[in-house]
């Protein structure tokens, strides 16, 4: 497993998704390595092959600091932000780096009034319930592939 700390140039990305105006991806790559993941195309942006998906994660260590600057540019209260479109914001490394929590803290500190969406398959998401309670419009989506470990491991080798 390759883990690399990087400094990103930006963190709040304009989205072309129908239900999100912006996305925040605190990591490049995803340790879960799900065989069905559409985000595996991101491998090419860090010089990897699609088959390497799940074997590397690049950690955007400056994500909360970047968001602190970038969130001030959003004036519209009807804006939606999605965590995350091409990674799982609560994969295992989040326990160490706390980048997703840091970014959500920035939103609460700045009294963000828009909609926040979170997509994950990790139980770690419950760690941040205290912050979720401070956001007026938040949705958390959880993926549960199967209740049988053998089936889950087939599709999600590291989940």
Where would I find each of the regions flagged by the language model?
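N-terminal [4Fe-4S]-dependent radical SAM core
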Residues: 1-30, 40-80
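Glycine-rich phosphate-binding P-loop
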Residues: 34
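Conserved AdoMet/S-adenosylmethionine-binding subsite of the radical SAM
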Residues: 62-159
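Cysteine-centered loop/knuckle micro-motif
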Residues: 37
């Amino acid at each position: 497993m390759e883990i690399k700390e990087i400094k990103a140039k930006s963190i709040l990305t304009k989205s072309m998704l129908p239900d999100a105006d912006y996305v925040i991806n605190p990591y490049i790559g995803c340790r879960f390595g799900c065989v069905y993941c559409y985000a595996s195309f991101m491998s090419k942006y860090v010089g990897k092959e699609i088959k390497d998906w799940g074997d590397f994660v690049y950690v955007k260590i400056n994500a909360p600091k970047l968001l602190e600057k970038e969130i001030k540019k959003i004036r519209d209260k009807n804006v939606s932000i999605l965590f995350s479109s091409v990674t799982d914001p609560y994969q295992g490394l989040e326990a160490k780096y706390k980048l997703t929590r840091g970014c959500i803290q920035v939103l609460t500190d700045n009294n963000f009034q828009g909609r926040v969406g979170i997509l994950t398959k990790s139980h770690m998401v419950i760690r941040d319930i205290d912050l979720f309670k401070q956001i007026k419009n938040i949705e958390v989506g959880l993926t549960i592939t199967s209740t049988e470990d053998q089936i889950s491991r087939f599709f999600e080798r590291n989940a």
